[in-house]
Amino acid sequence: MCKASVFVGTSLDGFIARANGDLDFLATGGGEPHGYDEFMATVDALVIGRKTFETVLTFDSWPHGEKPVFVLSTHALAPTPPGAIVERMSGAPADIVAQLAARGIRHIYVDGGITVQRFLQAGLIHRLIITRVPVLIGGGIPLFGAVERDIPLKHVATRQYASGLVRSEYVVAA
């Protein structure tokens, strides 16, 4: 079995990026750790959307180290940085999870607005870790779109940081 988790930052009004994809409002962590490294130590691979992949390519350095990154796209991908392990995949979320489980991958980090929404709708997300940045941006790309049914969550923990960030963790209730 392959479980899927989300670790994401949002504005207080629920946006993961500005309408143009800019993430500038997320960089207010003040250099303190917010659990990302600990989370990454628990995952075997990442599953991200093409737009998220293209955004990550603009960063100063590749943030995923030697973790395999599976990019969901039906189009060819932009060239990847040296040392990055990147593979293009497409298909239904359940099929993708099954393919990754068959490769021995037990825990994936799902990232990207549409990708998170698709995996949630398919009932494949087990855990959500959401860090809220204390800023209202008024519009942009929402973390959650319309849902076809309620998705009950159970609150596990919340932590407030000196920088003002608030991280909450939820598990998806059965």
Predicted regions and their residues:
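Enzymes that bind and transform nitrogen-containing heteroaromatic metabolites
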Residues: 1-174
